Amino acid sequence: MLDRLLAAYRIETILRDLLVPYLHDLGERWARGEVSIAQEHFASNLLRGRLLGLARGWGQGHGPTAVLACLPSEQHDLGLIAFGITLYRRGWRIIYLGPDTPIATIRQAAESIAPDLVVLAGTVPEPFADHSDAIADLARHTTLALGGAGATEELATRTGARLLEQDPVSAAQSMDSAMPRPQHTSAPLGPA
């Protein structure tokens, strides 16, 4: 079914209008006890595998570089993957660190890669609050954005980070549009 949708619609449309709403609904149904944790994990892992297939090669992009990570104890990464796929389709190079990433690992990646953007994601506010000092320190050294239901405007303002829109496709499109691009000129370089 997903393959037929991918053949008929743009990936961004499928992510925004089908997969993200489905995942929200699945999470709500799990919270109400209508689906088991096994069913939720099965559906999420099936979608994760398919999305990561779409992300194949995203580490070799030639545009700006983004490091994407879920905060420590955060396992829900599908929105972050959708965000990364959208950036990748806009020419970005994606370094995906995954769920439950230690802050020290995120900091080390930011220092060694020197990305144009670091994105931290979380579905609940506690990991953001627990690591707010490290987040503020990271924001002083790189362009940092916070995403997911756990990220708040107050935290973004206090730490110096940007707050992403809740829709990962719109968030990626907004970040891409906000990033400066190198200016190319057609002027000659001078005598050979």
Regions inferred by a protein language model and the residue ranges of each:
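Short glycine-enriched loops at secondary-structure junctions
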Residues: V20, L71-E74, G150
